Swiss-Prot record:
One of its GO terms (biological process) is regulation of DNA-templated transcription. It comes from Rhodococcus jostii (strain RHA1). PANTHER family: HTH-TYPE TRANSCRIPTIONAL REGULATOR RUTR, HTH-TYPE TRANSCRIPTIONAL REPRESSOR KSTR. The lineage of its organism: Bacteria, Bacillati, Actinomycetota, Actinomycetes, Mycobacteriales. This is HTH-type transcriptional repressor KstR. Controls the expression of genes used for utilizing diverse lipids as energy sources. InterPro entries: Homeodomain-like_sf, HTH-type_TetR-like_transc_reg, HTH_TetR, KstR_C. It comes from the Bacteria. Residues 1-28 are annotated as: Disordered.
Amino acid sequence: MTTSSRSRSSTVAAATLGEDDLSSNAQKERRKRILDATLALASKGGYEAVQMRAVAERADVAVGTLYRYFPSKVHLLVSALAREFERIDSRGKNPPGRNPLERMQLILSQITRAMQRDPLLTEAMTRAFMFADASAAAEVDQVGKLMDRLFARAMTDTEPTEDQLAVARVISDVWLSNLVAWLTRRSSATDVANRLELTVELLLGDGSRRPE
């Protein structure tokens, strides 16, 4: 998802019930079960396996209830992706490293390897994120902000500046495009690692390395 597509208008946005919209523990638990069911189905069969009726059955909720929480499978999968990034972000720790370059390389490597360990799930979440329309703009924006914040945290121990957030956004876009290239077998895992390393060195390094 490019920066421009991330910022599309949300004039036709459909309502997904997030954690903050749920008043009872039972509702929050139901939402968790729905997302857990979505991840389990996607992990076994990819994007096509995530059907609303199958999710409802696995989560033990009525189909009508599922639609009140998530209007479509795209909303489901993008929300599941957001939850995965929230889990990483909630740890609240900067990755080890002597400087921003080392920390950024480490966090990119960790996230990329985690995604590559479950290619069907990654394909499903990434496909939904890439092709979400304006109705899922709020969910897409949430994922984008989580990625930007996660990568910006590698650059500073304090609140990131606008410049740092801009760099993080570039890295987010490069990371996502390379993840898609790996999923579609246009790039190997080694190719992805090399490109990400070069990107980080060009943006955060001392300028000594140039692309060959």
